[in-house]
């Protein structure tokens, strides 16, 4: 009984089997089941892993491999454990635990984006190629024409046009009828005749005024001449009287 009890696994080992055995340290150039790398190296993702090829974790998707106990399911959308009969001393609970461990590894491998499982790598590549081709066939909008910035050392050419605003267009000429033209011509002739008549009357008035002025200046000169003649006559009479008186007087 003691030997049978010792060979029978405990309930803890049945309900909580180990998820995955720890991989053995990889050796350069050695390939085997123990060297399969199924988890990305967190230190490598942060850029501070110094183990290089000897690291037990994968450095990139090319270095990452799927565990042999995992296979692609029938639908190709999830990773499931191989449906093999349980080993000696293990029950069906261990198979379920292995499946859960495989799902956790797949989530750690590709990151948790909200979905339960991530598509396999081959199918993701096909979808990426399809989306890339569809994106390349989509028409691209035309780019806006932009002028290159002008260098400060190069002077910009002056504008050929004047900065002043153009003069406004003159208003259209008004149309006149024949009657309007005749009336304007008659009015111009009347104005011309009035100017001619006023210019002919003005010299005549000037001549009349000049004659009146000459007459007024000539009359005072005649009066003065008569006075001068009278004065001369009186003076000559006085001299004759004095001479007669001197002759008539007796000598002393």
UniProtKB/Swiss-Prot annotation:
Single GO MF descriptor: zinc ion binding
Q: Where is the composition biased (Low complexity)?
A: 133-149, 229-238
Q: Which Gene3D superfamilies match?
A: Zinc finger, CCCH-type
Q: Is Metal-binding tagged as a keyword?
A: yes
Give the keywords, sorted: DNA-binding, Metal-binding, Zinc, Zinc-finger
Q: Where are the zinc fingers (C3H1-type)?
A: 35-62
Query: Is-annotated flag, keyword Zinc-finger?
Result: yes
| UniProt region (Disordered), positions on chain | 71-95, 109-180, 215-252
Which PROSITE patterns does this UniProt record tie to the protein? ZF_C3H1
Protein name as annotated: Putative zinc finger CCCH domain-containing protein 58
